Amino acid sequence: VYALFWTSSRQTFLFGRQVKFVKLKTQGEIDAMAVAGVAAAKTLHGLKDACKVGANTLALEMMARDLLASFGARPALLNYHPRFSKEPYRFATCISVNDAVIHGQPSEKTVLREGDVVGLDLVADVDGWLADTALTVIIGSGNVKAQRLLSVTQESMW
């Protein structure tokens, strides 16, 4: 029988498994994280502004790489190789269009159309500090259903 939570002199356990707690950051570390956050946010909003009818997702990918570099950041997703995958991820972004729920791969063949619902996801790395951010946009004015989806999703965050 495992105890829900207990501590020993050196270790803390939850449901019988050792857990690590988050180390409190110094002001300098917080400031460094903020630099990565600003790079990620500015890049994401640049991509949002470029999401227009006729744009292809590979062009958005290349724009993201350029923007991240201009803010002194490296794309953390590019060449990321998780243990479960045979190959590393080849892109700086995940761009999902319509029914591609998450982690869509950019492609020259994926051209944005009026009403598309597009998820933009990226991770900025500045000196080892990572900022992971995502945003969903509707291309053009979209339809009532898509607008409602984004509205309800946004409201659920707060």
Where do the protein language model's features map onto the residues?
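Active-site neighborhoods and metal-handling regions in enzymes and metal-associated proteins
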Residues: 3-158
